[in-house]
Amino acid sequence: MRTYIRSMMRLFTIVPLLALSLIATVPIARGDQPPPYRSMLYRPMIEAARQAQTAALAAANPRATNSRSLTLVGSLALPGFNADVWAHKGFAYVGTWGAGPDACPATGVRIIDLDEPNDPTLVGAVAAIPDSTQEDVEVTRVNTRFFHGDLLVTGIQSCSDVGPQGIDIWDVTDPRHPQHLGFWDSIGAFGVHELDLFQRGNRVFVAAATPFAEFAIGEGDFRLVEVTDPRNPVQVGEWGLSDIGVEPNCDDFAQFCTFDHSVTVNENGKMAILSYWDFGAVFLDISDPAHPTFVGRTVYPTGADGDTHSVALARGDNLLLTADEDFSPGEILNPPPDDTWGFLRIWNVKNPAAPVEIGRFSTANSLSTRSDGFYSIHNPVVRGNTAYLSWYTDGVRVVDISRPRAPREIASFVPPGVEDPFGFFPPVPIVWGVVVERDLILLSDMNAGLYVLKQKQAE
């Protein structure tokens, strides 16, 4: 039996927002709602937004586009609070963020046709469920005796005491006419923050991060949900820190804080890597889905702030890139250079029981304490020896990792600052996600929407 932890965090006040009209809604059964752990997850960004709002208003000039070796092909304006981006078979999928009952547009996952990259077109949306966010989304082709086609899953988190929580599942084989298939109710913490959809043999799974579930209901933050039959999803495994004798802890983000923020599964579908914030990246053997087993973890140097937000594997799963998301440079532990905005770490994980850090990459702004934007890394994506890094106000950075001990930036794009239609965020670039689709690089900006880029060919 897991230990129940009932420590509560003080709440933050959020600027009231206008409601957005919904494109597609599906009624979802509500479960018993836990305390507002969402405030624990988003308070650092909320506080950074307040500081950036003040600093940006004091700036003399608006921000302009800044590009190196990347060409802007097209863009699509989307209402504010855009979240992650995914791409599949010529379509982009953009999720929706939210931070509380008065800051929850719930516009769902927007579906965008990229047939003409210079003129991307919104063709619909799914999972626009009231009182919830739909931040992380993945689409993949699956083939089982229950379903054959393109499957979309998105993590659902509650914005209020009536919001749903779990995984919403859709058939997007025809993206212009999506069909709802099923819903898995996590009934704990506030839902699924990030996820990874994968097929292994004749079974299909979603690896899901449910932050603070171990605090709220005593079940593991990591869940493994089988969606082989997407109309009847079922949890088959779970894991939490108490499985290795570690008590989960989070003291108002001021000290060592442990929760599963994200999860990535390796190529063969037998290893899950959990982004466990200050506890580092945790490797779990999921060969037996019902019994995830701890293998090892990355360990931060003494004095490091931590904040493992998300990860990406490279080099045949022998390298791990970890994104340390830090919104409070110099405020929590030590002044720079020890405590900066968040940056990239590169690890040798040939032996996942004992990862070794071998390289780092930062932008000039992320090494500063400037407060007129958000200069932390967010999400990494890897293709071959190239890493594509979404970096909030520093846009997207394209980094050569062929020499992982000395990563080198080869391209970048910082979009212009755009007004947040709700007045919540400052008018600065806030690039949430990046994904590569054929020869296109897609970015999602929280205020602006979708950007479509191409990398310039060397002359």
PLM feature spans:
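Feature marking well-ordered beta-strand scaffolds used for ligand recognition
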Residues: 28-459
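N-terminal secretory signal peptides that target proteins for export/translocation
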Residues: 1-9
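Bacterial N-terminal signal peptides
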Residues: 12-24
